[in-house]
A protein has these predicted regions:
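Short, electropositive alpha-helical surface patch
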Residues: 122-137
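A generic local secondary-structure boundary/capping motif
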Residues: 57-60, 126-130, 153
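N-terminal amphipathic, basic helical "cap/leader" segment at the start of enzyme domains
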Residues: 1-64, 166
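Active-site-flanking beta-strand signature of metal-NTP-handling nucleotidyl enzymes
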Residues: 68-72
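Small-aliphatic-rich amphipathic alpha-helix that forms the alpha element of a beta-alpha
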Residues: 75, 79-126
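Generic beta-strand structural signal
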Residues: 65-67, 108, 136-138
């Protein structure tokens, strides 16, 4: 880990899963919660906004990707005396580390999709034997796309819409 972090606390844990059984259990947990998200929690507007991305609660790629990287933020650390250690800016620190990881994966020719599986964190934390101070921030399936994979043609905002020069 070479990412900057608040007070150099490095408040992250990257869990790399390659075991087929664990990947399938992760898929089951994610799909169960995602179906509830799509049908009940998020509402019609959210579901309609996602239509152009052709996504739904079925996440076959969680079984087929060679690796799943689950990134946990450490809300606090543990000192040798058992007391809690403050992790300053833990979410933004871990988010920066994730951005660097995404750039490195792309540079290595690997593919992923960012996934923030809502309401799955506690079950995944237990499945992966993570401590209570860790909260799931991001799930990345990593590998190469299928030869017949299609990606929606998405355009990006022009630079002048996202940057102000003074």
């Amino acid at each position: 880990g070479t990412s900057p972090s608040g007070a150099h606390t490095e408040p992250w844990t990257f869990v790399v899963v390659q075991d087929p059984y664990l990947k399938h259990k992760i898929r089951e947990i994610v799909e169960e919660e995602e179906e509830i998200n799509y049908k009940k929690r998020m509402g019609d507007r959210w579901v309609n906004d996602l239509k152009r991305l052709r996504t739904n609660w079925i996440k076959e790629y969680l079984d087929t990707a060679p690796y799943l990287i689950l990134i946990f933020k450490q809300v606090y650390g543990q000192l040798p005396n058992g007391k809690k250690k403050t992790h300053y800016y833990n979410e933004i620190s871990v988010s920066i580390a994730c951005g660097i990881l995404l750039a490195a994966l792309q540079n290595a020719g690997l593919y992923t999709v960012t996934s923030t599986p809502l309401n799955c964190g506690p079950q995944l934390r237990v499945l992966l034997h993570r401590p209570a101070n860790e909260k799931l921030l991001l799930l990345l399936p990593v590998g190469y796309p299928k030869k017949d994979a299609t990606v929606p043609a998405l355009s990006r905002k022009p630079l002048e819409d996202i940057m102000v020069v003074m």
